[in-house]
């Protein structure tokens, strides 16, 4: 007789939830799948669309990661892989992984999260492991989520300590190593008590396999803080290098060569390179979360001047690239192709993409803007009121590379127009391509002024 598999639910099937769902569906023990996995989405139009797409074998995420695509196709063939819009399906699940978006809103910051936990409290049983993966303002779980969650559980005569509530923030990276970022990235975790921490650790080890990849914190608030500090550190470094990008042109220096020389020192090997700007769902919002904690949860007056300035600089960072391009040519009535629309390489994720904002700004300056990106569908580009360019074409007045897709590194510049201006604003082209363009007077690299 076949042993009944333990049911695991993944709440949220977006850029974090979907690969998590696929990884869990593929965990095996003794050549047998370990879990019956249920993916649950919101019961609204967007959520229903995602569920219908999965049931009809239509991907909602296009990925350059072969492993992601392999696991996705495998999941479609399994009878014990389910998707749903109904939180009542949690009743039979002993493990729940929560991967939903969290954003600061004027009046309803915690509404979606609290509503979700209200429903979870109505449907779960004792001894259920809950792992919350969402990035949150430090103090959210203990001050906002858990008190209300505990009250709702008590209505069903379940004590909070009878549920294994834990927190382990995600470090998922869309792109060519999408699945690897889940199974190989170090994880931090904590829980409301010793047993919750232990249950969380044991489950994460099913995904990671290596204990050395795990760091346990004493409290959930420490774990929440770790994610915000991690992303704030990165955002500040990006803002810092923008100052040097601006001065490098006036000094007529090759900033990229300087940075690569500095990187050889072990203490400085993670210094950032000049680029178009901050994009994606995390770095554009996460640094502000500690300010929210200070003001709304702690009711304190901490100003966080460094983080505040970094956020301001990063929001305006594309202006550095715009000024750089404008300094080389007049943009009005020019036919421009931008290569790259996602926020990072080898993904179709356009959330808060600086490339899209850059294209919109060029359009407002009177340019006729086309966008070419092998990972993005035409309708997604046209929603931004930008022309879609399906294939790379050298017959433009200006070609601007903004995202370092691997496919762009294979381009040969044989038929480029004599007067075409070519820009690399984000370290997109490889050394071979740069060498082939070295003698072209109309080729410009952000941060490299005398290469």
PLM regions: where:
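Structural/interface elements that position substrates and couple domains in central-metabolism enzymes
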Residues: 1-451
């Amino acid at each position: 007789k076949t042993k009944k598999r333990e049911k695991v639910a993944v709440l949220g099937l977006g850029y974090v939830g979907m690969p998590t769902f696929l990884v869990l569906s593929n965990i095996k023990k003794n050549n047998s799948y370990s879990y019956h996995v249920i993916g649950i989405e919101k019961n609204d139009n967007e959520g229903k669309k995602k569920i219908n797409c999965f049931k009809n074998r239509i991907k909602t995420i296009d990925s350059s990661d072969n492993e992601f695509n392999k696991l996705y196709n495998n999941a479609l063939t399994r009878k014990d892989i389910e998707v749903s819009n109904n939180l009542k399906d949690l009743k039979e699940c002993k493990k729940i992984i929560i991967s939903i978006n969290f954003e600061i809103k004027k009046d309803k910051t915690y509404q979606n999260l609290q509503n979700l936990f209200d429903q979870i409290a109505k449907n779960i049983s004792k001894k259920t492991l809950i792992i919350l993966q969402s990035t949150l303002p430090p103090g959210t779980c203990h001050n906002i989520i858990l008190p209300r969650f505990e009250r709702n559980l008590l209505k069903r005569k379940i004590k909070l300590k009878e549920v294994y509530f834990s927190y382990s923030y995600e470090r998922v990276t869309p792109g060519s190593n999408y699945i690897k970022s889940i199974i190989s990235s170090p994880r931090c975790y904590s829980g409301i008590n010793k047993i919750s921490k232990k249950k969380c650790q044991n489950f994460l080890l099913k995904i990671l396999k290596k204990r050395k990849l795990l760091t346990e914190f004493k409290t959930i608030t420490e774990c929440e803080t770790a994610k915000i500090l991690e992303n704030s550190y990165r955002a500040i470094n990006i803002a810092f290098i923008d100052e040097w990008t601006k001065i490098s042109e006036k000094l007529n220096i090759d900033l990229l060569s300087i940075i690569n020389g500095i990187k050889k020192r072990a203490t400085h090997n993670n210094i950032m390179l000049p680029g178009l700007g901050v994009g994606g769902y995390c770095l554009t919002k996460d640094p502000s979360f500690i300010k929210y904690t200070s003001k709304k949860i702690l009711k304190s007056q901490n100003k966080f001047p460094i983080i505040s300035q970094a956020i301001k600089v990063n929001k305006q960072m594309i202006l550095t690239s715009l000024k750089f391009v404008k300094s080389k040519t007049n943009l009005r009535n020019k036919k421009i192709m931008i290569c790259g629309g996602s926020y990072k390489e080898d993904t179709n994720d356009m959330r808060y993409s600086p490339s899209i904002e850059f294209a919109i700004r060029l359009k407002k300056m009177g340019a006729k803007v086309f966008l070419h990106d092998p990972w993005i569908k035409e309708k997604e580009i046209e929603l931004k009121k930008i022309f879609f360019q399906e294939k790379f074409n050298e017959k433009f007045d200006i070609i601007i590379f903004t995202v370092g897709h691997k496919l762009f590194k294979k381009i040969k510049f044989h038929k480029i127009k004599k007067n075409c201006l070519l820009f690399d604003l984000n370290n997109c082209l490889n050394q071979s391509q740069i060498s082939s363009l070295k003698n072209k007077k109309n080729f410009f690299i952000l941060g490299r002024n005398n290469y």
